[in-house]
Structures are given as structure tokens and as C-alpha cells.
Swiss-Prot record:
Any single biological process term in GO: secondary metabolite biosynthetic process
Residues the record marks as active site: 119 (charge relay system), 209 (charge relay system), 236 (charge relay system)
Enzyme class: hydrolase
Induction of expression: Expression is positively regulated by the azaterrilone A cluster-specific transcription factor tazR.
GO MF entries: hydrolase activity
Protein name: Probable esterase tazC
Family: Belongs to the LovG family.
Domain of life of the organism encoding this protein: Eukaryota
Function in brief: Probable esterase; part of the gene cluster that mediates the biosynthesis of azaterrilone A and other azaphilones, a class of fungal metabolites characterized by a highly oxygenated pyrano-quinone bicyclic core and exhibiting a broad range of bioactivities. The first step of the pathway begins with the non-reducing polyketide synthase tazA that assembles one acetyl-CoA starter unit, five malonyl-CoA units, and catalyzes a series of Claisen condensations, methylation, PT-mediated cyclization, and finally releases the first hexaketide precursor through the R-domain.
Length: 265
């Protein structure tokens, strides 16, 4: 039953939010509180719970140790049980649809115009946008499944995951069952550039993040040269101070307007 309580944010454009590995939606909601505050008049944020059990991530235990249980989207090590790609994608989709349905019941009516993820969630966010791109190219726009205008990738690393391996798969892409690429990337696949996400993305990099070089690989090798970059003097976490958040807010609002997102007057 749909909520009937008046909500000034009900009709706002929606952003799908994907937490990091070894985290959960509650933690990601806390991590993004400053960003959401600045964007609260423009977007409604919908948080998804990862489908798979996980140990807490190394950057989670310091502040959110008691916020479990912890979840993940993909396998990140041999401690995570093997799963076939089809089942993994189905579980991810089920989690996303459940969050969307829950927000509809809570009164949300806006279009899903963007997807935002942190760390492993950023990999998934980019991969969902990539799937939309591939489906539109190979099956037609009506079959793309989503209509995200852009993605916000917080401290994300490649490679992209092919969520539809029957439509596109090469040595530069993972499938959803893998921990990492399991074979060398061929020069032929690199030159064909079928692994490149050309839809708009905003990348947020912490300059003190130990994984910074890997995040730059996602930006430079897997995304369009028109991708936007916001750098800040922080580690592997979401910016929380106003001075660090405002440059990202500016990029999000600017890109939203450029990609046709309509805000209420």
C-alpha cells in the first residue's frame, strides 16, 4: 500500500545508492549525510541492501563496527563462496528491485535519473550504467531496462562487470562470478574499446586513498574522456566536510541539468 502522508521529496528525481563491500545501506546513508543534505531539494535517495553476506570492510570497523550485518555485491576474495554469473546478477537485481518497490510504497514517484556507489558499490554503479549502454546499442533504447542519465562513482575501481555477458564479453571485462580478471587483457580487445563506458560519469577520488591508482584506472581506461573528476584530500571514505562536499554537489547539479534532468520550479 502506497504511503499517503505528504512528502515534499516524493516527486523528486531519484538516485539509486549502492554501498561498499563489507558495508550496508544504513552505513552508506550515514556516510552520505552531508552530500544528501546539500542535494535534498533536488533529489530523493534510494538505498539498496547488498544481496550477499560479508565480513566488515577494513574501513568500516573503525566507525561502524556495531552497524552490522554487513553485505556485499560481488566476491572480493576466496573467503566468499563461488557463485555462477547468472545467479549473482539475479540476486543483485532482486535487491535493487526490492529497494525500488519499497521506495514506491513510501511515496516516491520520481524517475531514477542517476546511480551512485562507493567502492565496490561504485564498480556496480558503473557496471549498471554500462549494461544500459550495451542494451541500448544492441537491443534498442526501449530494451535498456533503465534510464540513468549519469553515475556518481566514489572511490571506485575497475574492471567493469558485464551484467549481460551474452551481449558483450571480452578480456577487459569481468563477469559477476569473478573476484578479478583471470586472464591477460588482449591488445585486440583494448583497441576495440567495447569495454568503455561512454555515458556520463562523475568520479570522486581521495588523494590519500591507498587504492587511488586503481581508481584512476577505472577513470582513464574504462570511462569516456568526458568523464568528470572531483579530487579531495582524503582517504577511502565519502567526503563529509562542507568544503569537500560542495565541489561534488556543483558537478552533480551541473551534469544533471546537462543530461536533461528536470527539477521542479
Amino acid at each position: 500500500m502506497r504511503a499517503t502522508i505528504d512528502d515534499p521529496q516524493a516527486a523528486l528525481p531519484r538516485i539509486l545508492c549502492l554501498h561498499g563491500g563489507g558495508s550496508n545501506s544504513r552505513i552508506f546513508k550515514a556516510q552520505t549525510r552531508a552530500l544528501r543534505y546539500e542535494l535534498s531539494n533536488y533529489f530523493r535517495f534510494v538505498f539498496v541492501e547488498g544481496p550477499f553476506d560479508s565480513e566488515p570492510g577494513p574501513d568500516v570497523t573503525s566507525a561502524y563496527e556495531k552497524f552490522g550485518p554487513f553485505r556485499r555485491w560481488f566476491r572480493s576474495g576466496p573467503q566468499h563462496p563461488p557463485i555462477d554469473s547468472h545467479t549473482a546478477v539475479a540476486c543483485i537485481e532482486e535487491s535493487i528491485y526490492a529497494a525500488m518497490e519499497r521506495d514506491d510504497l513510501q511515496g516516491g514517484t520520481g524517475d531514477y535519473v542517476a546511480v551512485m556507489g562507493f567502492s565496490q558499490g561504485a564498480k556496480l554503479a558503473a557496471s549498471l550504467l554500462f549494461r544500459q549502454q550495451i542494451r541500448a546499442e544492441k537491443l534498442g533504447q526501449a530494451m535498456s531496462g533503465t534510464n540513468f542519465r549519469f553515475a556518481i562513482l566514489l572511490n571506485g575501481r575497475g574492471p567493469l562487470v558485464s551484467m549481460d555477458p551474452e551481449l558483450v564479453m571480452n578480456t577487459a571485462l569481468m563477469d559477476a562470478s569473478q573476484i578479478a580478471l583471470d586472464r591477460p587483457v588482449t591488445l585486440e580487445d583494448l583497441c576495440r574499446k567495447e569495454h568503455v563506458l561512454r555515458l556520463p560519469t562523475i568520479h570522486v577520488h581521495g588523494l590519500q586513498d591507498p587504492g587511488l591508482m586503481l581508481h584512476r584506472v577505472l577513470l582513464r581506461e574504462y570511462c569516456s574522456k568526458n568523464a568528470r573528476l572531483v579530487e579531495w584530500d582524503g582517504a577511502h571514505r565519502v567526503p563529509i566536510k562542507t568544503k569537500d562536499v560542495l565541489p561534488l554537489v556543483h558537478e552533480i547539479l551541473q551534469l544533471a541539468k546537462q543530461t536533461g534532468v528536470v527539477f521542479a520550479a
